Amino acid sequence: KHVSVCYNNVSIYEKGGFKMKVVVAIDSFKGSLSSMEAGQAIAEGVKRVYQSAEVVVRPLADGGEGTVEALVEGMGGIFVTKEVTGPLGAKVEAVYGVIESKEDSSKTAIIEMSAAAGITLVPEESRNPMNTTTYGVGELILDAIEKGCRHFIVGIGGSATNDGGVGMLQALGYDFVTQEGKAISYGGNGLRELARIEEANVHPSLKECTFKVACDVTNPLCGENGSSAIFGPQKGATPEMVQELDQLLLHYAELSKEINANADRFYPGTGAAGGMGFAFLTYTNATLESGIQIVLTETKLEELIATADFVVTGEGRLDGQTALGKAPIGVAALAKKYQKKVLAFAGAVTPDAKECN
């Protein structure tokens, strides 16, 4: 028996006695299919032709929108809904994921910052980083700690904030206070009031926690390439606000050295998400990592690809931007390492997608 399918001069086949192993890791088709739904559809198609094939489907995401859904669905976790403080101070319902390790029963929380402090939660006419806070992100972390999580994967894209992560740290028990010892207010306005930082009331379990922060930008906290200058305008900052916020974050960074002498506002990525990169690196046990690399590591995709006969990946739109580090390229790079053939599926393919080859 010999069944063959050809695509772009690539042949995948099945002969008597040979059991083909196909690894499928495909990003979501936004608005249509989640990562796992797309992967299962491809798996079903493969099995229709090669009944004896072993098809392994793994979730895929780049650390941004859809990462919680992809990892929770793909790794047998649960979704948790929690009411938290939104970016404007009003309550919002946010969802995060919890995955329990089958090896040692440890729990990992998967959190997207945008669920609690995202730009989509703020009407366009209300976007103003002097007012918006990351407090709700800290509340999600606290809730996960109370549920036994000590490992965290946090995606920090899509934020509405420029508070240096101060709101998140306030929720975790750090006291950011005025000259009179009162708690500062939310957002950039609160940074105007900041006189000192105290750590006596930090949640005791925070020191036991590790954070992998999905960060794919290299901007420092301050300066012409910093958080306020590069990302502030898209969050509603006027040129005057940008200048003031930059100075306020500089003051915050200097005060932070009293808590952590190694606080480094120049470190690449500290300017990510309005300074959340700086907050995580300075105040928690965190690393800033490529979003796709975090996902590939957590799903142990490399081990699967190493023993695969064929690899399938893709996303909603395959174009020149895909080649610049989006999720399917991470999969393709692993496949190339082990000299595996790769097929990509997409909802749309543009002419410049040839850059992916």
Could you say what each language-model-derived stretch is?
Residues 7, 16, 21-156, 160-357:
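N-terminal loops that bind phosphate or other acidic moieties
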